[in-house]
């Protein structure tokens, strides 16, 4: 089975070349200096990797999946795909800044799973999103065991987790017991096999659908998120993805979403995040000085929720007048504090809890930065990420 059961296996994997080191440098991108407690993305900052040209493109309010090979995504490299033979992990990292007055600050490494571009910022009602299930791969079914086997891997089906909502299509006739235009939920058997359930609860319980024949033609599974596919641990951020600042307004910002238990009609809690007026490029809109409506970088979830499977509505309560923003679905990998100018912050993730964060194939890795004090524009950050797989 992929993964590491001992330190000896980690050492063996590294000796066998099953590792990757990436050096990076990114510039702080906003057109105005940050104030303390603000968070910004480094997506569009110059450096290595270069600035993205993705997050202010595409159709309004439509989900767009992001992978490390997505055109113009400009993500951190992590060694390419290794599944299902191996599992990849982030083993260690360091980061540093030599830019004056930047430290102390905090860097957060995140996997951006996908995003919704919002250009209709003058609309003040909750706007419905489009969530087309665009990830797809083919499968065959065994009527004797009810087990389905992946027969293509273009969209990395080894990433699919138990409880993921899917739909099916076919060029012929689906296996008996299954239908098109119907929601099913995955029971993951292995990285190459799965079963299907009629509900999320049945998927978690392992109660599969009885398949009584293999059907005819080519069968296809479609799903939404390319990683963390059931939404567990997935969070959201609102950020200015454009070079132009947003307009002069301070709207409440809220989401309607489906949670990772596949429960619909979930909502941002009552004390809503408040967007900054004239928010500059790369700003996570509701971060900044303390007070009502100011939060850490993720949007708060409804009580009891553990993640977002899809966003169904997006709302700014008053007109943002001009500009645009994006809402991204992200999974935090780790954080590293930078306490002192010129002194690297280091993380040995083998010995932390939880240790060895998993890096899924296709991961779109980026940095966010949380300012501890006023941060000048074009401030540089640099460092190194170390990955190992086995």
Please identify what each model-predicted range represents.
Residues 251-263, 382-387:
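Extended low-complexity, serine/threonine- and proline-enriched intrinsically disordered segments
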Residues 132-224, 246-248, 257-356:
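Small/polar beta-strand repeat architecture
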Residues 40-43, 90-93, 234-239, 308-319, ...:
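Short, hydrophobic/proline-enriched secondary-structure or compact coil segments at domain edges
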Residues 2-35, 323-390:
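C-terminal interaction-tip segments
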């Amino acid at each position: 089975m992929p993964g590491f059961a001992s330190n000896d296996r980690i050492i063996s994997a590294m000796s066998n070349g099953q590792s990757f080191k990436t050096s990076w440098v990114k510039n702080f991108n906003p057109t105005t200096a940050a104030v303390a407690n603000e968070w910004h993305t480094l997506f569009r900052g110059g450096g290595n990797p270069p600035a993205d040209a993705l997050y202010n493109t595409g159709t309004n309010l439509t989900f767009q999946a992001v992978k490390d090979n997505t055109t113009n995504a400009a993500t951190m490299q992590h060694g390419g795909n290794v599944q299902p033979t191996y599992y990849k992990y982030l083993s260690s990292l360091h980061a540093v800044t030599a830019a004056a007055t930047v430290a102390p600050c905090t860097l957060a490494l995140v996997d951006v799973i996908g995003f919704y571009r919002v250009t209709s910022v003058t609309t003040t009602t909750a706007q419905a999103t489009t969530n087309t299930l665009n990830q797809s791969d083919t499968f065959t079914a065994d009527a004797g065991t009810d087990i389905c086997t992946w027969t293509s891997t273009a969209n990395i089906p080894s990433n699919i987790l138990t409880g993921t909502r899917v739909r099916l299509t076919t060029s012929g006739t689906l296996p008996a017991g299954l239908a098109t235009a119907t929601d099913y939920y995955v029971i993951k058997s292995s990285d190459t096999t799965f079963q299907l359930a009629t509900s999320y609860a049945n998927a978690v319980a392992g109660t599969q659908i009885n398949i009584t024949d293999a059907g005819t033609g080519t069968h296809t599974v479609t799903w939404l998120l390319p990683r963390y596919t059931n939404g567990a641990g997935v969070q959201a951020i609102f950020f200015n993805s454009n070079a132009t600042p947003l307009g002069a307004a301070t709207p409440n910002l809220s989401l309607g979403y489906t949670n990772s238990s596949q429960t619909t009609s979930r909502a941002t809690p009552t004390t809503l995040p408040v967007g900054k007026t004239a928010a500059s490029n790369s700003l996570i809109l509701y971060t900044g000085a303390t007070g009502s409506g100011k939060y850490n970088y993720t949007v708060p979830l409804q009580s009891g929720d553990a993640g977002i499977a899809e966003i169904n509505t997006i709302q700014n309560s008053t007109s943002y007048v001009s500009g645009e923003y994006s809402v991204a679905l992200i999974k935090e990998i780790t954080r590293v504090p930078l306490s002192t100018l010129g002194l690297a912050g280091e993380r040995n993730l083998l010995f932390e809890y939880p240790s060895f964060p998993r890096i899924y194939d296709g991961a779109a890795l980026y940095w966010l930065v949380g300012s501890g004090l006023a941060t000048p524009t074009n401030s540089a950050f640099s460092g190194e990420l170390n990955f190992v797989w086995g």
